[in-house]
Design a protein with these regions (language model features):
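A cross-family signal for key residues in well-ordered alpha-helices
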Residues: 128, 141, 165
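Hydrophobic alpha-helical transmembrane segments of polytopic membrane proteins
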Residues: 171-185
Length: 245
């Protein structure tokens, strides 16, 4: 019996379950493709932005870094660094206290990082839901198919293949379709979650490097210290840490 013949023997309720699974599969693939394109764009633009950021760390101009951030708006690193350097430039031009400047810059970096992470995670909840619930939808269709098979046996009084094939087909197709939809969603969710962790590390490292460069804090460990852990009293008012660029 071919697959099309199996589908032809599926009941109305089982068909509705399969249509639901097929629609969820389409939505899942759409989310996967969209996230893949966005993450690839973020990675590529970040690689292009990093040389400009390194140039700034070695004595480049503030305005050059701001312009580089505008040219690479899809880069997660550029988004965070731009938020910090724009805040720093605004505070510097206003002539505020350097201690307040550090607090404002670190706050801008934290806020931008949080917002960027929210954007990166958008859609992953849907993939997680698909991966965890679709197998149960398929199992539900399986149970319905088996029930229909037993109902056919009870109605005819015999258990021949021609009697139960419709219910069995419904059960098998529902199970297979549920697994088929769930596996890509789970794999994609785990892959994208790993990418987000990598992006988070890159954003945190860039934030720490920016604060270290702007305020000359030698004690700052780029890889180990969160931006939120930087303490304002470490900056000395009027010292080289607040030298105009």
């Amino acid at each position: 019996m071919s697959f099309t013949e199996l589908l032809g023997q599926v009941g109305l309720f089982g068909g509705a379950v399969m249509v639901c699974l097929a629609l969820l599969s389409v939505f899942s693939v759409g989310v996967i493709v969209d996230k893949h394109r966005r993450f690839r764009s973020a990675s590529r633009q970040s690689e292009k932005f990093k040389p400009e950021f390194k140039k700034f760390l070695h004595g480049g101009e503030v305005q050059d870094l701001i312009e580089a951030g505008r040219l690479h708006q899809n880069s997660h690193v550029a988004q965070v660094v731009s938020a910090g350097i724009i805040e720093y430039d605004g505070v510097r031009q206003s002539g505020r206290d350097p201690v307040a400047s550090l607090e404002l810059v670190t706050s801008a970096l934290r806020d931008s990082m949080s917002e960027t992470l929210i954007q990166l995670k958008r859609g992953l909840g849907f993939l997680a839901t698909i991966g965890s619930t679709v197998p149960f939808i398929g199992l539900f269709g399986t149970v319905v198919g088996i029930i229909n098979a037993f109902r056919s046996i009870a109605a005819t009084g015999s258990g021949g293949m021609s009697v139960v094939s419709g219910g069995i087909a419904e059960a098998l197709v529902s199970t297979a379709l549920g697994i088929f939809v769930a596996i890509p969603a789970v794999v994609a969710f785990n892959h994208f979650t790993g990418k987000i962790e990598t992006f988070h590390v890159e954003m945190n490292r860039a934030s720490s490097q920016l604060v270290n460069c702007l305020f000359k804090i030698p004690e700052l460990e780029v890889l180990d210290v969160e931006v939120a852990d930087v303490k304002a009293p470490m900056v000395k008012k009027g010292g080289p840490a607040y030298a105009a660029r």
